[in-house]
Amino acid sequence: MASFDQMRANVGKLLRGIDRYNPENLATLERYVETQAKENAYDLEANLAVLKLYQFNPAFFQTTVTAQILLKALTNLPHTDFTLCKCMIDQAHQEERPIRQILYLGDLLETCHFQSFWQALDENLDLIDGITGFEDSVRKFICHVVGITYQHIDRWLLAEMLGDLSEPQLRVWMSKYGWMESENGKIFVCNQEENIKPKNIVEKIDFDSVSGIMASSQ
């Protein structure tokens, strides 16, 4: 099988050409989606092109490929990729399994119900078969949310939010983000006050720019 970089280059040429929405290219684009899933890579433009082709050619719709596209979009939170992809799927297909379950998982993540997300995922682990790095990508998003929300967080709560991590696993993520152990079972995330940088706006107005206004007011 061609390497991902080679496939990306080939697909990039295809998407720039007049055949961007030629249904004969669907097989190539669908293989590319599968390769992204296996190699923990991502190409939003190509994935949106697949969904657009499904819109134009409903008979060619593939539930499995669409599910992979949605799951890959979730790995790129907090960007809006998931919403973009969801809006290109008609309501009837959104009600199908596994798409319905994936949309539910996405809603839990976007509303920061992280413990509920891991519980729902645990009940549907088959959804992420073949999606390399999915869980760690989600953990990166959760750490992003924690980093902009908390100054201190309970150790047990952080472990739960990251999917009931063991102590060694939790330490790996703490080290990755530079979070320090604090007292009373808490973790120091950051000083949010230091992150608030007020912007001073200084507007310089020279005399020439107001002299006309002054003259007209006399």
From Swiss-Prot:
InterPro entries: ARM-type_fold, CSN8_PSD8_EIF3K, eIF3k, PCI_dom, Transl_init_fac_sub12_N_euk, WH-like_DNA-bd_sf, WH_DNA-bd_sf. Pfam families: CSN8_PSD8_EIF3K (PF10075). GO terms for cellular component: eukaryotic 43S preinitiation complex; eukaryotic 48S preinitiation complex; eukaryotic translation initiation factor 3 complex; nucleus. One of its GO terms (molecular function) is translation initiation factor activity. Residues 42-204 form the PCI domain. GO terms for biological process: formation of cytoplasmic translation initiation complex; regulation of translational initiation; translational initiation. The keyword Protein biosynthesis applies. It is found in: Nucleus; Cytoplasm. The keyword Disulfide bond does not apply. Keywords: Cytoplasm, Initiation factor, Nucleus, Protein biosynthesis. Component of the eukaryotic translation initiation factor 3 (eIF-3) complex, which is composed of 13 subunits: eif3a, eif3b, eif3c, eif3d, eif3e, eif3f, eif3g, eif3h, eif3i, eif3j, eif3k, eif3l and eif3m. Component of the eukaryotic translation initiation factor 3 (eIF-3) complex, which is involved in protein synthesis of a specialized repertoire of mRNAs and, together with other initiation factors, stimulates binding of mRNA and methionyl-tRNAi to the 40S ribosome. The eIF-3 complex specifically targets and initiates translation of a subset of mRNAs involved in cell proliferation. Belongs to the eIF-3 subunit K family. This is Eukaryotic translation initiation factor 3 subunit K. The gene is eif3k.
